[in-house]
Design a protein with these regions (language model features):
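A broad, low-specificity signal for short, low-complexity segments enriched in glycine/proline
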Residues: 1-5, 117-120, 155
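Active-site-proximal alpha-helix that buttresses catalytic centers in soluble enzyme cores
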Residues: 1-71
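Aromatic-acidic/polar surface patches that form glycan- and anion
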Residues: 18, 42-45, 119, 123, ...
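A generic local structural motif
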Residues: 26-31, 140-146
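Phosphate-handling substructures
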Residues: 61-144
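Extended, basic/helix-rich recognition subdomains
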Residues: 148-159
């Protein structure tokens, strides 16, 4: 199986769409993807993602299945230095170094900073969504690995 992840074109966040440059990029992307043998398309519910996919889907005469968990991760946390809400992956190294559990794959969502957001629930929403998608193609999670069932395939999927 080939999974191709494509990020949205240059966004205009104010209108949840694309800038002029983003629209040009989406059109150029559609020319490239036209050469690919893609079996299924999946897309975030956000406008900028749908707009990026629109040219490719139109050229392929296809539709994308909208998966809510593909939207940008929305779990702001409280910055311990400023007291303001912020995205959790944008801390300076000093904050990360003072919170070594953020590097631990079992503890990072339990960190007091991450607990100020809805991190664990959001993380599970995304990972459960990905696991469901992969299981549809015959790849079933078992701890840190995925087992390939007899139902696996060599399809190409754009996300």
């Amino acid at each position: 199986m080939k999974i191709i992840f494509i990020r949205h074109g240059e966004p205009n966040y104010e209108i949840d769409s694309l800038t002029e440059k983003g629209w040009r990029g989406a059109e150029l992307l559609s020319k490239r993807t036209a050469k690919w043998n893609v079996t299924d398309f999946y897309c975030s519910p956000l406008g900028r993602a749908k707009d990026t996919a629109s040219f490719t889907l139109k050229n392929a005469d296809r539709e994308a299945k909208i998966l809510p968990w593909l939207r940008e991760f929305d779990a702001p946390v409280i910055d311990p230095e400023t007291g303001k809400r912020r995205i959790p992956w944008d801390f300076l190294p000093d904050v990360l170094d003072a919170n070594r559990d953020l590097y631990d794959n079992h503890l990072w969502t339990k960190n007091p900073i991450m607990q100020t957001g809805n991190m664990d629930e959001n993380y599970r929403f995304v990972t459960d969504g990905l696991d469901t998608l992969l299981a549809h193609y015959g790849y079933v999670r078992d701890g840190y690995r995925y087992h390939a069932s007899d139902e696996t395939n060599r399809e190409a999927v754009i996300v």
